[in-house]
Amino acid sequence: MKIKAYAKINLSLDIVGVREDGYHLLEMVMQTIDLYDVVHLNIKDKDIEINSNNCNIPLDNRNLAYKAAKLFKETFNIKEGVEIYIEKNIPIEAGLAGGSSDAAAVLRGLRDIFMPNLNNKELAKIGVRIGADVPYCIYGGTAFCEGIGEKITKLNPFKDHYLVLVKPDFGICTKETYSKIDKKEIIKHPDTKEIIKSIGENNLKLLCKNMENILEIVTLEERSNLKDIKKELLQYGSLGAQMTGSGPTIFGFFPYRDSAENCYRKMKSKYNEVYISKTI
């Protein structure tokens, strides 16, 4: 069985509180894009085995896809094992939920094999035990996410808008970013209602005017080259550019495919990891 595991971007990310256990309460507008890993599942006798074309991801119980298979087996008392092969295309440590999407793909695949009557809501309850982005990745599409990311409200589809993504040659520790933002004074929060309104109207220009990621307060201050990437995307015709998740990937929206391709060529001459994609 092959399952596509799609990347996500944050059209907005806001922090609205902190739980007693230290997890931050968020308001996010999330969007699936046409950049994906391919997760191959093969049922075997007993154990869980994981392999990949990317040597930089863990191939043991640290991998979220492994954790997903293990939790699914334990939850439903599945005796069979599974061989997982991850064909990795989404950059790692990028703010694109690659690991969470792989985990969601494993859950969806095992659901289809062993528990076909299990709905996404029930599957998401398992997913949140693996990671906060996993429930959203089970649903995909355009969504407003609250809590730590597990409360999901589907929004009108925001499809076929082109974007260019640039992943710098370093990763970002999500935990460190959130601990640092606790020490910052947040003066301006994203206008989430206006962002949701722009999606309802399928208005890309209005979205780009309002989209905002509160974590940029930390990451762009520490990594000035991310500011440079944003400026370059805007210089090459982007209607709006922003960091996704805790970074470091920066994306920019474009009105037409041609303008996105033009920007892609220019950015590719400067940076190693550049992608052209569209919302789906």
UniProtKB/Swiss-Prot annotation:
Annotated positions binding ATP: 91-101
Record key words, sorted: ATP-binding, Isoprene biosynthesis, Kinase, Nucleotide-binding, Transferase
E.C. number: 2.7.1.148
Coiled-coil segments: none
Molecular functions (GO terms): 4-(cytidine 5'-diphospho)-2-C-methyl-D-erythritol kinase activity; ATP binding
Catalytic activity annotation: 4-CDP-2-C-methyl-D-erythritol + ATP = 4-CDP-2-C-methyl-D-erythritol 2-phosphate + ADP + H(+)
Pathway(s) it belongs to: Isoprenoid biosynthesis; isopentenyl diphosphate biosynthesis via DXP pathway; isopentenyl diphosphate from 1-deoxy-D-xylulose 5-phosphate: step 3/6
Domain of life: Bacteria
GO biological process, one term: terpenoid biosynthetic process
Pfam families, per the entry: GHMP_kinases_C, GHMP_kinases_N
InterPro entries membership: GHMP_kinase_C_dom (IPR013750), GHMP_kinase_C_sf (IPR036554), GHMP_kinase_N_dom (IPR006204), IspE (IPR004424), Ribosomal_Su5_D2-typ_SF (IPR020568), Ribsml_uS5_D2-typ_fold_subgr (IPR014721)
Catalytic machinery residues: 8, 133
Function: Catalyzes the phosphorylation of the position 2 hydroxy group of 4-diphosphocytidyl-2C-methyl-D-erythritol.
Similarity field: Belongs to the GHMP kinase family. IspE subfamily.
Name of the featured protein: 4-diphosphocytidyl-2-C-methyl-D-erythritol kinase
Natural source organism: Clostridium tetani (strain Massachusetts / E88)
